[in-house]
Amino acid sequence: MNLDNMVEGDDLLKLKDKINKVFFFRICGTGMGASACLLKEAGIEVEGADQSFSPPMSTYLDSTGIPCYSLDKVDKKFLQKYDLIIVGNSVPKVSDHAKLIEDCGVPFTSFPSVLGSFVLKDKEVIGLAGTHGKTTTTYFLTQMLESLGEKPGYFIGGIMDNRPPSKIGESKFFAIESDEYDSAYFQKYSKFRLYELNSMVLTSLEFDHADIYDSVEDIEK
């Protein structure tokens, strides 16, 4: 595994003003698609690719005008026209795709990293975590804040009620679905560790994701 071009934290933040065009490698995942929409809203040119495109995320991505390609069209020369590659956690550590990303010479990171560095800075971030109910509870919290007159930012891991899955918002509040699963093959820890949460709502806690956790106590840690 060659992580010479992997960026996160302060190193990623330093690149922010130099990033004009971003590529999402496996864009059709719910988190990846929602992240792509946030960066597009922030004024960054966004494109992506995946092996297959399934609704509802594929339908929503199509409506945004974000160019999406088949992964079989993606090679080193293709990737080198981008300033940053966002890698989905469906990319295995030992794979041709991982090697392609590592060897193309372009900085790469995960979507939780880019959200933490590019979107959530200076926001009052409320994380919604738990084994069950994260998406629904994030949606409810967003509606509650809106009913109080706020225009919050939000990040929901799904398409609900014909609203975008994510929005930067105008108020200081940002509600974000905070998944305990790993961020990427090069960041084998929970996504919410990269969000710098101000507060967290924990909906439930059960043993899950046996591929990265040994027990419910391991998840608690």
State the predicted function of each range.
Residues M1-S110, V114, V216:
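N-terminal leader/targeting and accessory segments in enzymes
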Residues L38-E41, K76-K77, N89, K93-K221:
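Phosphate-binding loop of NTP-binding sites
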